[in-house]
């Protein structure tokens, strides 16, 4: 039987890098962004709809369906330990813990909010992708394309929901969530990975940090509306702009309030 765990956290905080490194372990499979979380949420929606008309033992049937989906979603993967990647597993722990055969565990990547916002904006400027989803939204709202407006939109619609899910999991189930801070991962990768292995209760592994294969890349990356969103560098390094230079000192002060 496979053991199902989860990979969550904030966008632009190293989840693709961490997943690719964990995939080097012979016992671990880390997925790209997965639909499993949406499938689980969809099951609840369907049960709420059919419960009005149909007569059935909802408690028993719910258990059968949820537990079967969670147990069998990755039957085609030969590795015994699965980490399913989705930003919103934190807020889904209430449901998952009732139907999972093992204790739920989330590995959550984290980075300071100003750095996350800066990473998004730097990627836009670096790729010169004019039709990226952020600027498209600003145009539709007749807002000027400025880094200040970009930062506000990114936070409100893309970072805050993931942040709230992560905070929910940390607050309600602290023993089930392990945080991996981006800068620590880049500076001391093996040390951070060993902590993850210990948290997942699996044997340690000596990782390789050169010619890293992007094992968690998104085949449909263009559907995310920004080229290179899930690219990683083959050799472990940090090349980041100073948030003050990108979003300004005042925005750094505002968004730093949300840092853990």
PLM region descriptions:
Residues 1-5, 121, 128, 144, ...:
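PAPS-dependent sulfotransferases, especially Golgi type II membrane carbohydrate sulfotransferases
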Residues 63-75, 114, 118-199:
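PAPS-dependent sulfotransferase catalytic domain
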Residues 85, 96, 100-123:
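Conserved phosphate-donor/acceptor-positioning beta-strand/loop module used by diverse small-molecule
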Residues 14-19, 37-40, 90-93, 114-119, ...:
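Short catalytic/ligand-binding loop motif for oxyanion handling, primarily in non-cytosolic enzymes
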Residues 14-28, 96-101, 179-204:
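PAPS/PAP-binding and catalytic site of the sulfotransferase fold
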Residues 1-72, 76, 215-222:
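PAPS-dependent sulfotransferase catalytic core
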Residues 40-47, 96, 118-122, 128-129, ...:
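Short aromatic-enriched loop/helix-cap "lid" or pocket-rim segments at secondary-structure transitions
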Residues 69-95:
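Glycine-rich phosphate-binding loop used to anchor ATP phosphates in small-molecule kinases
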């Amino acid at each position: 039987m496979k053991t199902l765990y989860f990979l969550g956290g904030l966008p632009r905080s190293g989840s693709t890098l961490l997943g690719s490194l964990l995939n080097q372990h012979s016992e671990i499979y880390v997925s790209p962004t997965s639909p499993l979380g949406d499938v689980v949420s969809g099951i609840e929606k369907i049960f709420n709809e059919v419960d009005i008309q149909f007569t059935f033992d909802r408690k028993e049937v719910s258990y059968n369906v949820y537990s079967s989906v969670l147990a069998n979603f990755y039957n085609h993967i030969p590795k015994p330990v699965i980490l399913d990647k989705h930003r919103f597993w934190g807020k889904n722990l209430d449901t998952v813990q009732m139907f999972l055969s093992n204790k739920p565990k989330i590995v959550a990547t984290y980075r300071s909010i100003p750095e996350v916002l800066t990473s998004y904006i730097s990627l836009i400027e670096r790729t010169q992708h004019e039709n990226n989803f952020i600027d498209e939204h600003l145009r539709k709202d007749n807002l000027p394309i400025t880094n200040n407006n970009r930062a506000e939109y990114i936070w409100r619609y893309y970072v805050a929901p993931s942040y709230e899910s992560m905070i929910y999991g940390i607050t309600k189930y602290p023993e089930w969530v392990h945080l991996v801070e981006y800068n620590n991962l880049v500076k001391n990768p093996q040390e951070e990975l060993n902590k993850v292995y210990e948290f997942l209760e699996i044997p340690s592994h000596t990782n390789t940090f050169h010619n890293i294969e992007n094992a968690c890349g998104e085949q449909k990356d263009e559907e995310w509306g920004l080229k290179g969103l899930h690219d990683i560098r083959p050799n472990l390094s940090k090349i980041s702009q100073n948030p003050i230079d990108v979003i300004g000192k005042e925005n750094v002060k505002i968004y730093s309030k949300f840092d853990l």
